[in-house]
From Swiss-Prot:
Belongs to the glycosyltransferase 4 family. MraY subfamily. It is a multi-pass membrane protein. PANTHER family: PHOSPHO-N-ACETYLMURAMOYL-PENTAPEPTIDE-TRANSFERASE, PHOSPHO-N-ACETYLMURAMOYL-PENTAPEPTIDE-TRANSFERASE HOMOLOG. The lineage of its organism: Bacteria, Pseudomonadati, Campylobacterota, Epsilonproteobacteria, Campylobacterales. The gene is mraY. It comes from the Bacteria. This is Phospho-N-acetylmuramoyl-pentapeptide-transferase. Pathway: Cell wall biogenesis; peptidoglycan biosynthesis. PROSITE patterns: MRAY_1, MRAY_2. The keyword Metal-binding applies. GO terms for molecular function: metal ion binding; phospho-N-acetylmuramoyl-pentapeptide-transferase activity; UDP-N-acetylmuramoyl-L-alanyl-D-glutamyl-meso-2,6-diaminopimelyl-D-alanyl-D-alanine:undecaprenyl-phosphate transferase activity. Keywords: Cell cycle, Cell division, Cell inner membrane, Cell membrane, Cell shape, Cell wall biogenesis/degradation, Magnesium, Membrane, Metal-binding, Peptidoglycan synthesis, Transferase, Transmembrane, Transmembrane helix. It catalyses: UDP-N-acetyl-alpha-D-muramoyl-L-alanyl-gamma-D-glutamyl-meso-2,6-diaminopimeloyl-D-alanyl-D-alanine + di-trans,octa-cis-undecaprenyl phosphate = di-trans,octa-cis-undecaprenyl diphospho-N-acetyl-alpha-D-muramoyl-L-alanyl-D-glutamyl-meso-2,6-diaminopimeloyl-D-alanyl-D-alanine + UMP.
Length: 353
């Protein structure tokens, strides 16, 4: 809509991505702040709360009854803000909206299964969830490939591509999207723990897609120039605004959880932005907290299956620190600090190449 105003009413300031990114940020923020209290009241009335895992640390029992599925609100706000401010004839914007929508639907189904009175109180089975995720990721990766998105693989701090992936890029992109989606999902175990690292990651990724989409900046900073990709910075800005508003309600003690309907699309969209920005490997630094949490689970499960011994007191690793006696707030803030530092390191790749 705002770009239409520029085209038809000649409001020139609205042609700039930076301006529309700022507008999308505030639209998503205000919309989430307005809708979230209404959603929380509705969810409490419907008793839409996720059961607490029986093996969770004892202090988690007080979280019983906290509404879940808050992700529906901030994903909805992000999409609305994007529709109002971005060019809807932009291929990458359409792909971003599709990514959020598809993975949000998977999360909604999983959350609904958990809070309903069905026998499957654990939600979708891990196998079914993974199948749906790979099907959605395959659709997105396939569309990117058919559109002609570059399949060159770049590494941080090096200006030349490592190699051309060709059609195998589809498989690689699928794993980036699904892996990122599940990594954020695993991290979402404490109040606000996944929210702030997500805000930081989307801020960094928004800068990166803006750079690769800008011919002058991409050339100066020795990045590949991905035409029209810069428009995705508007969508990244919108999701940051929505998440900051969500943090108002999700900070400790949380009034609402994002649920799988929030964490799955967040992670998938992170992967999508990294693919578009040709920063798939750099995503390991951008989302270091999410990687750390995922690796802790892999090590725990692998060690127990191979040696019948556990590496950590409990996995994901934030539960390990809880079992060691760390207070929830201390764990959360320390993880935020690590996320902040890892994103600063990732941003160094803009200049050091």
């Amino acid at each position: 809509m705002f770009y239409w105003l520029y085209r038809h009413l000649e409001i020139n300031i609205l042609q700039y991505i930076s301006v529309r990114a700022g507008i999308s940020f505030f639209i998503a923020f205000v919309l989430t702040m307005y809708l979230m209290p209404k959603f929380i009241r509705w969810a409490r009335a419907k008793k839409a709360s996720q059961p607490i895992y029986e093996l969770a640390p004892e202090n988690h029992k007080i979280k019983a009854g906290t509404p879940t599925m808050g992700g529906v609100v901030f994903i909805f706000s992000t999409i609305i803000a994007t529709v109002l401010t971005a060019k809807l004839n932009n291929f990458y914007i359409v792909g971003g909206i599709l990514t959020l929508a598809l993975f949000s639907l998977i999360g909604i189904q999983d959350d609904y299964s958990k809070i309903s009175k069905e026998k499957n109180s654990a939600g979708l089975t891990p196998r079914m969830k993974l199948i749906f995720q790979f099907l959605c990721a395959a659709s997105i990766a396939g569309i990117l490939f058919l559109y002609g998105h570059s399949t060159e693989l770049f590494t941080p701090f090096y200006k030349f591509p490592l190699f051309e992936m060709g059609v195998f890029g589809i498989v690689f992109w699928m794993f980036v999207i699904v892996g990122s989606s599940n990594a954020v999902n695993l991290t979402d175990g404490l109040d606000g723990l996944a929210t702030v690292p997500s805000i930081l990651a989307f801020s960094t990724l928004s800068i990166l897609v803006y750079v690769v989409g800008h011919a002058v900046f991409a050339n100066y900073l020795l990045f590949p120039n991905i035409q029209i990709a810069g428009e995705l910075a508007i969508m990244g800005s919108a999701i940051c605004g929505a998440l900051i508003a969500f943090l108002w309600f999700n900070s400790h003690p949380a009034e609402v959880f994002m649920g799988d309907s929030g964490s799955l699309p967040l992670g998938a969209f992170m992967g999508y932005l990294a693919i578009v920005a040709k920063s798939e490997i750099l995503l390991l630094a951008i989302g270091f907290i999410f990687v750390w949490e995922t690796v802790s689970v892999i090590l725990q499960v692998g060690s127990y299956k191979l040696r019948q011994k556990r590496v950590f007191l409990m996995a994901p690793i934030h539960h390990h620190f809880e079992q060691k006696g760390w207070k929830e707030n201390k764990i959360i803030v320390r993880f935020w600090i690590i996320a902040f530092m890892s994103n600063l390191i990732a941003l160094l790749s803009l200049k050091i190449r």
